[in-house]
Design a protein with these regions (language model features):
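FIC/Doc superfamily catalytic core
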Residues: 1-192, 196-362
């Protein structure tokens, strides 16, 4: 990443963290929904973020949207949930794993192909067995015979980078994620869903590195595709990675500006006694699961495994979704290493507000 971009990005990330934007209630969930919505919109979906939020949270399909659009978004949501699991567990990237991601992305909308070289099913994540082009009369992607060996080369490259991700600065993590996106979509391992899977892998790298996951904005689709095409024709990722860095910087800048503007307004959960005094709005968010988590933490600093053991939980996914994530989103629990959420040394403790709530409900 160019030095000017690097400096600007680091300043914005520092400001993002200082303001606590990522620690807002429901920020992580709603930001993920935005990422999913923009990714499917690039592929033609017209479902909005608001419609996806209602569909994901309440199971209510958006009126006036096709079944295919609904399924595309639901499939991608399941794929991102799987990616979050992989990032949290630091699972090694393998060909079966990438195929599993593709299978989730295409689960309900994938086609079955019968070719001279055999049969393959998009819904199963099968690699393509025929050649494809970007568009009618457009450039052709890698010959299908080369897809599997080149994908394995990509996997080896990516695992080598992920092995050192804890020692990387944030701009370097983003660089790796952009490069991963470029390499995978250029190989084009599947007949369909390559863009969604490539963006998912990009976000997986970002999640594993503990930086803010990036949405590729659908309103910049033309510029995004143009940057990708120019880089592919040039045989270097420089143009594409530069474009992605500029998009990230612009998105973060807008987020910070909007937050600072909105923060000037009164915030419902604050009162005259300060932010560490629980109000009805805060205590109403303390589910039985969150209450158990607060009691288990007390004055201690514990890692996720220790917390699960104290709570008698074996399901890591349920623990994260029903206990830990809700407590963090509510501002009741914080990470000891907030700039590296996926760090192996990560531990959790009560915030000042969490201590007050624990005392109030104890």
């Amino acid at each position: 990443m160019e030095e000017r971009r690097r400096i600007r990005l680091e300043r914005l990330l520092d400001e993002f963290d200082r303001l606590g934007i990522g620690r807002q209630i429901n920020y992580g969930r709603l930001h993920l929904y935005s990422i999913i919505t923009h990714s499917t919109a690039i592929e033609g979906s017209t479902v909005t973020v608001e419609e996806n939020t209602v569909m994901f949270d309440n199971g209510l399909p958006p009126i006036g949207r096709s079944v295919t659009e609904q399924l595309m978004n639901l499939d991608l949501k399941r794929a991102y949930e799987a990616a979050e699991e992989v990032a949290a567990a630091r699972t090694e990237i393998t060909l079966p794993l990438l195929k599993a991601f593709s299978s989730l992305v295409m689960r309900n909308i994938g086609a079955l192909y019968r070719t001279l070289h055999g049969e393959y099913d998009e819904a199963k994540g099968d690699l393509r067995l025929q050649n494809v082009s970007a568009e009618r009369g457009g450039r052709s992607y890698l010959s299908w015979e080369k897809v599997e060996p080149r994908t394995n080369d990509f996997i080896a490259w990516l695992n080598e980078r992920l092995a050192n991700i804890d020692s990387m600065a944030a701009p370097d993590i983003y660089d790796v994620s952009f490069e991963a996106h470029f390499r995978l979509v250029t190989i084009h391992p599947w007949s369909d869903g390559n863009g969604r899977v490539a963006r998912l892998v990009m976000n997986l790298v970002q999640m594993e590195g503990g930086v803010v996951p990036m949405a590729v904005r659908s309103d910049h689709k033309v510029q995004y595709i143009e940057a990708l095409r120019e880089s592919q024709e040039a045989g270097t990722s420089e143009r594409f990675c530069g474009f992605m860095a500029d998009e990230l910087i612009d998105a973060l800048s807008q987020t910070v500006e909007e937050y600072e503007r909105d923060a000037e307004r009164d915030v419902p959960w604050l009162n005259d006694d300060g932010p560490n005094v629980p109000t009805p709005q805060v205590t109403s968010q303390v589910t039985p699961q969150v209450r158990r988590l607060l009691a288990a933490l007390g004055s201690k600093e514990l890692d996720a495994r220790e917390l699960r053991s104290m709570l008698g939980l074996s399901d890591a996914k349920s623990f994260r979704q029903l206990y830990l994530r809700r407590a963090i989103d509510a501002g009741l629990v914080e990470m000891t290493i907030p700039d590296k959420p996926r760090s192996r040394n990560q531990r959790y403790r009560l915030t000042g507000l969490g201590m007050k709530v624990n005392e109030t409900l104890g």
